[in-house]
């Protein structure tokens, strides 16, 4: 019963950290990344279609993304979709391929992005702590119902705290790595 609680707690915390890692891939760092275009949708024959389902996306240089639509007639719509996504990128087209140059970030913008990343990481720490609280509440109700003793409750809460500390450290590591990537010139 307690082991199931540990497993559920750990599983929920793993999901939180994975979600954070996925969110961090979307943060612009001054380097080109395929994930920068993840949210781009293109009006393709009246249907909003994800860009990655209608074009080849490549990164030929560290500050450039190329987008080659499979249907050349849709190139103008792809450009509009990138602009409408409002991700701070400006596409330029030669009629066959779209090139997106990633402008270098200013020092102020880098600090601003780092601050946003820090706030996001703090939100995920709160989420992990809420999972801990849920687990501790479950343990308290088990003790109240007489399913576990006070000693078992104390040991289990300590184990839940250890699991929480482990995941908080993972979140801090994700933040440190992303901050280094952002502030690096």
From Swiss-Prot:
Keyword Zinc included in the entry's annotation: no
Record's subcellular location: Cytoplasm
MF terms in GO: ribosomal large subunit binding
Record bears the keyword Nucleotide-binding: no
Keywords: Cytoplasm, Protein biosynthesis
Signal peptide coordinates: none
Domain of life according to the entry: Bacteria
GO biological process, one term: cytoplasmic translational termination
GO cellular component: cytosol
Pfam annotation, one family: RRF
Chief site of localization: cytoplasm
Family: Belongs to the RRF family.
Purpose of the protein: Responsible for the release of ribosomes from messenger RNA at the termination of protein biosynthesis. May increase the efficiency of translation by recycling ribosomes from one round of translation to another.
The protein, known as: Ribosome-recycling factor
